[in-house]
């Protein structure tokens, strides 16, 4: 079985995340795709604004109708800083005979050498990096044993930071965020300034 993983803060989840996941799923003919929300991303300190429970619930609401995708709470249960190596070790134990692919944006390639235990990580999973057609990534990754696969993607210029700012300014999230996640954000009053 071929299983893909897409990690991130998902604060909030948006169509850029989901289209990237779908592109990798289709191009690499994955059997499953697991979204892995981080408790705290190591290279983005203090970037998360909503609770782990809210981010998990938003993500589940966004993909619950799509049987190709599932959401794991492994990093949220672990808490603290979320290192990909810890999740890769966990998933390798869960799926010892399967092909595992960690999906990243091409913008992460120049930072990959900074990831914790990246050499071991390269033994546990292959990496799929998303690249926008016509905009090749010029970064050179020189990590022995690392298996990289390019995915031509429909990368969207959407950032969760921008979306949180839109909520603060009373602007719509329509066409940026899945409807069920928008409903959740509204019901929970997420990303609003404190009263």
Curated annotation (Swiss-Prot):
Pathway: Cofactor biosynthesis; NAD(+) biosynthesis; deamido-NAD(+) from nicotinate D-ribonucleotide: step 1/1. Transmembrane segments: none annotated. It catalyses: nicotinate beta-D-ribonucleotide + ATP + H(+) = deamido-NAD(+) + diphosphate. Its EC number is 2.7.7.18. The keyword Transport does not apply. Belongs to the NadD family. This is Probable nicotinate-nucleotide adenylyltransferase.
């Amino acid at each position: 079985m071929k299983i893909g993983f897409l990690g991130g803060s998902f604060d909030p989840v948006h169509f850029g995340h989901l289209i990237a996941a779908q592109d990798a799923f289709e191009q690499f003919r994955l059997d499953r795709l697991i979204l892995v929300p981080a408790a705290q991303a190591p290279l983005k300190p203090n970037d998360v604004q909503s609770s782990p429970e809210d981010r998990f619930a938003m993500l589940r609401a966004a993909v619950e109708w799509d049987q190709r995708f599932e959401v794991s709470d492994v990093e949220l249960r672990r808490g603290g800083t979320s290192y990909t190596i810890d999740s890769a070790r966990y998933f390798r134990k869960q799926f010892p005979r399967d092909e595992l692919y960690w999906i990243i944006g091409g913008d992460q390639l120049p930072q990959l050498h900074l990831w914790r235990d990246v050499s071991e990580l390269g033994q546990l999973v292959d990496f799929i990096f998303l690249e926008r057609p016509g905009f090749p990534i010029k970064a050179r990754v020189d990590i022995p044993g690392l298996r990289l696969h390019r995915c031509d993607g429909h990368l969207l210029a959407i950032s969760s930071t921008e979306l949180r700012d839109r909520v603060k300014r009373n602007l719509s999230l329509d066409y940026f965020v899945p409807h069920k996640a928008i409903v959740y954000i509204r019901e929970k009053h997420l990303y609003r300034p404190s009263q």
